[in-house]
């Protein structure tokens, strides 16, 4: 099994594509990267609505709130974690994984806090961790310690591939904004648990995106044999994310026939 989705399920420009709700999005994709929870907890009635708009085979991959990962730096935040997991509990059977997006200031010295945090989490969910500190990409003892600790706990190391957006010509504000915000870190395709999560940050150059994505075809085919990967496709202007899906899908299908036909979303160019 492989899960493929986008960083969010709605965008004003997707309305003309027929994607007007989570329910409609879930007809095309089997998972979503839940960025909204990084910034605020959804209201209880909203969580219930999300449950009503999806089926049991759909998966959410929500980020832990920034109040936990950034402001508390994983320390003394048991109440915040309990509040978050309780709020999301109506969706428990549909959680692909909860994951931490740690800031670049969270380095090797903070690993004891990470281990304590992960060890205190309930065991019924899968978890992931995205790191951004340079030493965790230097292939030294610090990175080995990180990978070993995640592996021992069965926690996925979230993989960020931002090569396309940083290789792009900065000709638009969307590109420039993404280049400022998305970390420029090496791509370390490390498998530490059974649900590897890949965040592919494309540019607005679909030819380049396809070229840079080729390395993932072999890796996904390999991992698919023993794990359940998650692939999330980003573009600087999220309005273009469905176009990236169309660009990469046939290559993915040749490698992983089980994903079936490309989602039946009209391409932007066909609407005018």
UniProtKB/Swiss-Prot annotation:
Alphabetical list of SUPFAM superfamilies matching this protein: TM1631-like (SSF117396)
Membrane-crossing segments per the record: none
Gene3D superfamilies: Protein of unknown function UPF0759 (3.20.20.410)
A Pfam family of this chain: DUF72
InterPro entries, per the entry: DUF72, UPF0759_sf
UniProt family annotation: Belongs to the UPF0759 family.
NCBIfam families registered for this protein in UniProt: PRK10302.1
Protein name: UPF0759 protein YecE
Species this protein is from: Escherichia coli (strain K12)
């Amino acid at each position: 099994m492989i899960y493929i989705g986008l960083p969010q399920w709605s965008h004003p420009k997707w309305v003309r594509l027929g994607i007007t709700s989570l329910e409609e999005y879930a007809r095309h994709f089997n998972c979503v990267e839940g960025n909204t929870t990084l910034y605020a907890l959804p209201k209880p009635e909203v969580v219930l609505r999300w449950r009503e708009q999806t089926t049991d085979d759909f998966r959410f991959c929500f980020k832990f709130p920034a109040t936990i990962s950034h402001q508390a730096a994983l320390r003394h935040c048991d109440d915040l974690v309990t509040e978050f997991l309780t709020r999301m509990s109506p969706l428990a059977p549909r959680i692909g994984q909860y994951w931490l997006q740690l800031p670049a200031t969270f380095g090797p010295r903070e690993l004891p806090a990470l281990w304590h945090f992960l060890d205190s989490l309930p065991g019924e969910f899968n978890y992931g961790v995205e790191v951004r500190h340079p030493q965790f990409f230097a292939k030294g003892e610090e990175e080995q310690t990180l990978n070993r600790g995640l592996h021992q706990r069965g926690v996925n190391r979230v993989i960020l591939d931002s090569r396309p957006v940083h290789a792009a010509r900065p000709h638009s504000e969307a590109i420039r904004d993404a280049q400022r915000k998305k970390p420029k870190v090496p791509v370390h395709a490390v498998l530490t648990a059974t649900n590897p999560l890949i965040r592919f940050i494309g540019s607005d150059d679909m030819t380049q995106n396809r070229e840079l994505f080729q390395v993932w075809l072999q890796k996904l085919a390999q991992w698919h044999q023993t794990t359940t990967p998650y692939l999330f496709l980003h573009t600087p202007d999220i309005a273009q994310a469905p176009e990236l899906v169309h660009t990469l899908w046939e290559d993915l299908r040749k490698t992983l026939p089980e994903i079936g036909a490309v989602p039946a979303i009209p391409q932007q160019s066909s609407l005018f």
